[in-house]
Amino acid sequence: MTLILGIDPGSRITGFGVVRDGGRGCEYIASGCIRTGSGSLPERLQAVYRGVTEIIRSHGPVTMGIEQVFMARNADSALKLGQARGAAIVAAAEAGLEIAEYTATQVKQAIVGSGGADKRQVQMMVMHLLRLVQKPQIDASDALAIALCHAHHRQSLIPHGLDGARRRGGRLRL
């Protein structure tokens, strides 16, 4: 059984989700949001780093899936998102976690079956797959979807010795 951390990065709200992959489906462990407040960007990035570090310490995942940066309409927003991703990746790398990155389309395809699914469709499918009674917050739901996507990809890659994945900078590119 493998504990998987999913991260939906953001400079103001970073969603997280932890699931246990037992090979025949995943079990919900925890989810929530790291809210960084209205401080300066360095303070918010530090809050993301510390929050992810605490989640790793509390739950002990061995691997992490994180969403890749998408092309935002605003270049400044994309840069801040990339910096928040970096803070989360450094926290995971320091803890020795295996890190894999997924596009939003890959996550939606793995969870809903359509790369064009909206956030509510993803949220409802996450609830169904993890047998949740209450709706998780949207950012937490996205993070749980990333964790589930990572579990799915790990299952499909393990029998092949991760031959289908490329390592770049210590991270798996799928």
Curated annotation (Swiss-Prot):
PROSITE patterns listed in its UniProt record: RUVC (PS01321)
Cofactor binding description: Binds 2 Mg(2+) ion per subunit.
TM segment ranges: none
Keyword Magnesium recorded: yes
Catalytic residues (UniProt): D8, E67, D139
GO CC, any one term: Holliday junction resolvase complex
Gene3D superfamilies: Ribonuclease H-like superfamily/Ribonuclease H
InterPro entries found in the cross-reference section: RNaseH-like_sf, RNaseH_sf, X-over_junc_endoDNase_Mg_BS, X-over_junc_endoDNase_RuvC
Residues engaged in binding Mg(2+) 1: D8, D139
Chain residues that bind Mg(2+) 2: E67
Functional description taken from the UniProt entry: The RuvA-RuvB-RuvC complex processes Holliday junction (HJ) DNA during genetic recombination and DNA repair. Endonuclease that resolves HJ intermediates. Cleaves cruciform DNA by making single-stranded nicks across the HJ at symmetrical positions within the homologous arms, yielding a 5'-phosphate and a 3'-hydroxyl group; requires a central core of homology in the junction. The consensus cleavage sequence is 5'-(A/T)TT(C/G)-3'. Cleavage occurs on the 3'-side of the TT dinucleotide at the point of strand exchange.
PANTHER family in alphabetical order: CROSSOVER JUNCTION ENDODEOXYRIBONUCLEASE RUVC
Family the entry assigns: Belongs to the RuvC family.
Subunit structure: Homodimer which binds Holliday junction (HJ) DNA. The HJ becomes 2-fold symmetrical on binding to RuvC with unstacked arms; it has a different conformation from HJ DNA in complex with RuvA. In the full resolvosome a probable DNA-RuvA(4)-RuvB(12)-RuvC(2) complex forms which resolves the HJ.
NCBIfam families: ruvC
Protein name: Crossover junction endodeoxyribonuclease RuvC
Originating species: Azotobacter vinelandii (strain DJ / ATCC BAA-1303)
